[in-house]
Regions:
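N-terminal twin-arginine translocation
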Residues: 22-31, 36-58
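Active-site gating/metal-coordination segments in enzymes
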Residues: 132-135
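N-terminal secretory signal peptides
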Residues: 1-24
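Compositionally biased, intrinsically disordered low-complexity segments enriched
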Residues: 11, 15, 25-28, 51-53, ...
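Non-catalytic scaffold segments within catalytic domains of secreted glycoside hydrolases
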Residues: 53-114, 120, 124-126, 140-478
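Alpha-helical and His/Cys-centered functional microenvironments
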Residues: 13, 17, 32, 179
Length: 478
């Protein structure tokens, strides 16, 4: 729920204080020995084109199933889930501890770190024009204040490859994983977290910003509130006694007695830290590149009250998971990323399981592509800035079901456009079958399968289907 005026003043003061500290630290970094110095600006021939997409908004001129000129069609990855060998990250530590909540470690993942050129080339081959990917903070800043020029150069090559292929790079600065040292000082719960994130954002933007098409600061920073804001989540390993014991042991391994990471820690404090980090990160990026379009991507469900008396639980969930991000986005976002996979059925006791007999995905939630339309409509009611679908997809080994899911989800986007909702792109999760966190490599979300022994890529029919929609800018029958 929106904060009081006094709370807003305290929050603004906190942001200003964090930004002042960040600016001081940045000057020290740029002047200090052994740190990365600012490079000269790249030549005009290497500058990124302006990707501030101004898609045609006259929905009345669109035929049914048609999409406006300039609409972004793409697929997404995340660094830790595809790159492999992310040894300096918090997640790598947690995956390789014994006991662990992870079904298996990420290991070499999809070896995307070495095969990014091959993977990016798949996008225009299929007909897609956008690649959403993340930078790995733990690679770029493996120790506090020490920025790796080699890793910055690596991501420069990734961005240059996107431009060479005619693909818009949509860059996420943080997709869950953080440097191990950051988690060991308290992660997003630390009072210094937002300053450290702003410093990282500034350094990356100063080095790579002119090659970026558009960016998001954080990926699904509201995920815990989405999952646990109301009772009823089934079959979760998080929040258990084993979970707390693993956090304690991770803190011992760090030698600090502290460890907080993504979904491992005090959920309320983590969420508060992420809200502040988005604001300071946004300001840091805008200071370096005022013209760069900056947003945030939020986890959403299509929330539906299906039993009398569930309205209170609906209000509680939305006020915890969505409203704080709508509030911050009104002043600190140029666009808003909607990430939705299914619906949430709500009753007076909280979240309800899917009805018996309904089709489920391999993640165990309901196969319900229409959820995307519901999430977009709800967001539009509360936020009048451009929307992008930054993630949407389905875990299944039956690719005919993925095609059906895409068709019905994209139809929902088309319905939103017909209602004059400003949706400017659809980014599918995911490009590759990749590491899915606690579930390891079991779930298959990818448009492209990966043999995790040979790293051979195989394009699925669903990838061709989505590419045909993108080529024609029109919904196609599956």
């Amino acid at each position: 729920m929106p904060g009081s005026g006094m709370e807003s003043q305290r929050e603004n003061h906190s942001v200003e204080k964090s930004l002042n500290v960040w600016q001081s630290q940045r000057r020290q970094v740029l002047q200090g020995g052994g740190m990365v110095a600012l490079t000269s600006l790249m030549s005009a021939t290497a500058m990124a084109q302006n990707h501030t997409i101004q898609a045609v908004r006259n929905s009345n001129s669109l035929q049914q199933g048609e999409f406006p000129d300039g609409f972004l069609w793409g697929a997404a990855t995340a660094g830790h889930q595809v790159e492999g060998g992310n040894i300096n990250s918090d997640s790598w530590l947690l995956e390789n501890m014994k006991p662990t909540l992870f079904d298996e470690p990420s290991g070499d993942a999809c070896d995307h770190y070495h095969r990014f050129g091959e993977d990016i080339a798949l996008l225009p081959e299929l007909g897609l024009n956008t690649f959403r990917f993340s930078l790995e903070w733990s690679r770029i800043e493996p120790e506090p204040g020490q920025f790796s020029l080699a890793e910055i150069d690596h991501y420069r090559r990734v961005l240059q490859t996107c431009h060479r292929m005619g693909v818009t790079p949509m860059v996420t600065y943080n997709h869950f994983t953080t440097p191990r040292w950051f988690a060991g000082m308290g992660g997003w719960e630390s009072p210094n977290a937002s300053q450290l994130f702003a410093r990282y954002c500034a350094m990356v933007t100063s080095q790579l910003g002119e090659l970026m098409g558009m960016v998001t600061t954080l990926n699904e920073p509201n995920l815990i509130q989405l999952l646990f804001g109301i009772p009823g989540l089934q079959q979760t390993k998080l929040g258990t006694i084993e979970d707390q014991e693993i956090i304690r042991k991770a803190g011992e391994r760090m030698g600090t007695g502290l460890f907080s990471s993504w979904v491992f820690g005090d959920y309320e404090h983590i969420h508060r830290g992420l809200l502040l980090a988005h604001r300071t990160g946004y300001e840091a990026i805008k200071t370096e590149r005022p013209e760069l379009q900056v947003g945030v991507s939020i986890a959403m469900e299509d929330d539906q009250v299906v039993e009398p008396g569930g309205e209170g639980m609906l209000d509680k969930k939305q006020s915890l998971a969505y409203v704080p991000w709508f509030d911050v986005a009104r002043r600190h976002a140029d666009f808003f990323g909607v990430q939705c996979y299914s619906r949430c059925r709500i009753g007076p006791s909280g979240r309800l399981p899917p009805e018996p007999g309904v089709p489920l995905t391999d993640m165990g939630y309901e196969f319900y592509p229409e959820a995307l339309e519901g999430a977009l409509r709800y967001t539009h009611q509360h936020l009048k800035i451009p929307l992008y679908v930054t993630e949407n997809g389905v875990a299944t080994t039956d690719d005919t079901r993925r095609i059906e899911y895409i068709r019905r989800a994209v139809a929902g986007v088309s319905h939103c456009l017909a209602s004059d909702i400003d949706v400017r792109g659809y980014i599918h999760w995911s490009l590759l079958d990749n590491f899915e966190w606690l579930d390891g490599y079991r779930p298959h979300f990818g448009l492209v399968s990966v043999d995790h022994k040979t790293f051979h890529r195989h394009i699925k029919p669903s990838a061709v289907y989505l590419g045909e929609i993108a080529r024609h800018n029109h919904l196609m029958e599956g």
